[in-house]
């Protein structure tokens, strides 16, 4: 009975550790509590769960383009906000300003998507500013 109980406990711990390993912490990648704005031309969404990504081209001071990638919400959230089809749909080339939580290193062209502001001034929020 003791061997069986020990086996069950060890299996449970193994399963739990795999689950915990699979989930990630935002604090290890993004500078939580900080905010940045990036303006550029929309390129595309990659709609996959659990986190979609959005890419924009940003022009540097020297005129060269840098592709930025932002992690956003789920496919359902993107659809619900009408970003793929609907009132807030983005088309390649649309000029937008993206509010993000920047990368922890402060240099990488990546961020956690907080909001998109369109050329006409309206904003779509993914998360509240204090999250």
Locations of regions flagged by a protein language model:
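Conserved hydrophobic positions within beta-strands
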Residues: 38-42
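Bacterial N-terminal signal peptides
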Residues: 7-19
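Short aromatic-glycine-enriched beta-strand elements
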Residues: 48-59
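A short macromolecule-binding patch
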Residues: 61-74
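Short, structured beta-strand/loop micro-motifs enriched in basic residues and often containing a Trp
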Residues: 73-81
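OB-fold/S1-family single-stranded nucleic acid-binding modules
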Residues: 101-128
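Short nucleic-acid-contacting surface segments enriched for D/E, G, S/T with interspersed K/R
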Residues: 80-98
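Short boundary/loop segments of OB/S1/cold-shock single-stranded nucleic-acid-binding domains
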Residues: 21-36
């Amino acid at each position: 009975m003791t061997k069986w109980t020990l086996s069950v406990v060890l299996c449970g711990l193994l399963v739990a550790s795999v689950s915990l390993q699979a989930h990630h912490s935002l604090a290890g990648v993004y500078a939580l509590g900080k905010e940045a704005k990036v303006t550029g031309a929309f390129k595309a969404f990659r709609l996959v769960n659990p986190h979609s990504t959005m890419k924009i081209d940003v022009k540097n001071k020297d005129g060269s383009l840098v592709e930025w990638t932002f992690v956003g919400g789920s496919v359902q959230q993107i659809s619900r906000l009408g970003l793929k089809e609907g009132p807030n749909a983005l088309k390649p080339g649309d000029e937008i300003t993206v509010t993000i939580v920047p990368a922890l290193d402060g240099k990488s062209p990546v961020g956690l998507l907080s909001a998109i502001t369109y050329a006409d001034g309206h904003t779509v929020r993914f998360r509240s500013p204090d999250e």
